[in-house]
Amino acid sequence: DVSFTVEDGEMLVITGPNGGGKSTLAKLLMGINEATGGKIILDGQDITSYTIDKRAQAGMGFAFQQPPRFKGMTVKRLLSLAAGRELDDTTCCELLSSVGLCAKEYINREADATLSGGEMKRIEIATVLAKDHKICVFDEPEAGIDLWSFSMLIKRFEQIHKEKKQSLILISHQERIIRMADRIMVIGDGKVEAVGTADEIVPILFGKKPESCGCRIQKGGELYER
């Protein structure tokens, strides 16, 4: 059982060992999996039974761990659909550039299997950024992204957090993402093991021995078990 609240404008990072329940939680939040109990409340509204589309309409944005592909749809069209309005080339280029893509090469390409997993991941993140959602959920946004693009993505998250005051939930093993958080929630065995600030939680994650904590942290390009 997991129970937590995300405040307006808060950045919450969820981390923990593989198989601990992070992605399952993300799928529940996104509406991919159906909850067997409890409720999901957004601005006082019970959205537990909402479909993915209806949750998006209610103000929730998602970036999945495995981005869907859209044969026959251009990247520009995909961004416009995500924004809920027709976007011009300049706006599309700005969105794509903010996630580390050379924009002019992508806006008229199809968002399909001709793009790599890392490219699709960044395009999907750009679709979330195309609209001012009440809350955005990013499931392992660093997956498949090169270090240069990841640095740009970090700056983008920091900018959103500072300027737009959107609530952000990031599920990640990446230390740089973990350290950005207002709060960190550690999940293991389907339960909340710890909640606190980066100053409180990061030393615990790095300080415990592997046998006493299952936490898996990514530092730079390498993975560390803690």
Question: Which stretches of residues belong to each language-model region?
Answer:
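Conserved ABC transporter NBD signature motif
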Residues: 38-45, 91
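ABC ATPase C-loop
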Residues: 128-129
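ABC ATPase NBD coupling module
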Residues: 46-61, 205
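The feature captures the beta-strand-to-loop junction immediately N-terminal to the Walker
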Residues: 15-17
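Walker B catalytic motif
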Residues: 140-141, 148
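Helix-to-loop junction immediately C-terminal to a conserved catalytic motif
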Residues: 30
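Q-loop/switch helix immediately C-terminal to the Walker
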Residues: 66, 72-88
